[in-house]
């Protein structure tokens, strides 16, 4: 009986505290905070988020009632949704460092060994050092590097040959694109690549998809961490996938350690090893293991970050691009005519051709607009009390930029659901333009995508090589690829099959990489 009375007292007190918290949260709006969705004890605004629509679409729809910027409660957490480019740029650019924090969640902590990576790590000295180190390595081996262009072209040739050899059979494009992009990133990170059917590559595909599927579910355990004491199939699967990934990363790490040389940097992992050794051997106050945090965990998670993000995002953009080209054969034909005119059939496309292929570049930009690979950017956290526009924002509030809303704003884009590469061309159709400031496909500011330049290189070269040699269609009587998308860590197209028909003169692969 006494136990029951104690439970009742604790329940009443707890409920009272929660009601007080809700009252205080609601009062934020009257003190200058953004308009808020309804808030209830314990669950916050979750009842308002029940919908069959994907989150980015629902958040876009809710702005009709609450305005471009509004707030909600995810359990005990204040979340502010930003759906307009002016406020988005204030968060990302004008006040980038103030909003550079990251929230801690159960799933991302499992994925990153408690935030020891770049994408999900909180802002601070350790994060800045890691990002600077990785950016330097990417500049050395990636952006503008002739060696990385050669690697991409090698994989583009292999991909085109695989597609050509499929003959009249329909082919699932997803694993082939993923392997091609994986090999580019593996060459950059590990100086290695994979052949079709390689067991290690197949394991990589499996754990990557498992991570994407589980992290994407916005599990209740991330809102209420105490739920992890109960059996959870998603968490169990995530742990299994992370374990497989970590074994692969550890294997690559040990291989690099065994033959590492200070006189040669072969790849990104070598660059990180050099930075780690410098930190271990440097006794100055400016650089120590404590200040930069370059432990083995940090090193492995940083590489894992680049590997995971670099493969999933770029391959997804390529899948969307080909899906839209199948839907719009006139766009595909115009790109091919542009390639024929500028590149011809006696050589392969090169990065130096980008400025001379405006319609292809415009098409890539339109794909990134209409189907942003990350429709909701990774949440930011306010590190101090601040503001967004006229709205007060309290320290610790989570900010989500709805890139989907920015890219589908009817006031910024004419017929935003229409696929129209021409919107990115000047009036003469001879040069590129950005017709609206509401366009941020790679984010912006302090947390801008590290691999933006590399991704643009890959997308351009893979598409130009494919379209120079092949025409992409579906078999007669087969449905066109769905353009709805599957929401997750990235917005993936539903799997589809293609027919890759060699263009005239390209029945055999007569041009190789130089």
UniProtKB/Swiss-Prot annotation:
UniProt GO molecular function: heme binding; iron ion binding; lyase activity; steroid 17-alpha-monooxygenase activity
Organism listed in the record: Oncorhynchus mykiss (Rainbow trout)
CDD domains noted in UniProt: CYP17A1 (cd20673)
Activity regulation (UniProt): Regulated predominantly by intracellular cAMP levels.
GO BP terms: hormone biosynthetic process; progesterone metabolic process; steroid biosynthetic process
Domain of life: Eukaryota
Protein name per its UniProtKB record: Steroid 17-alpha-hydroxylase/17,20 lyase
Binding site for heme: 449
Record InterPro entries: Cyt_P450, Cyt_P450_CS, Cyt_P450_E_grp-I, Cyt_P450_sf
UniProt EC number: 1.14.14.19, 1.14.14.32
Membership in a protein family: Belongs to the cytochrome P450 family.
Localization, UniProt: Membrane
Keyword tags: Heme, Iron, Lipid metabolism, Lyase, Membrane, Metal-binding, Monooxygenase, Oxidoreductase, Steroidogenesis
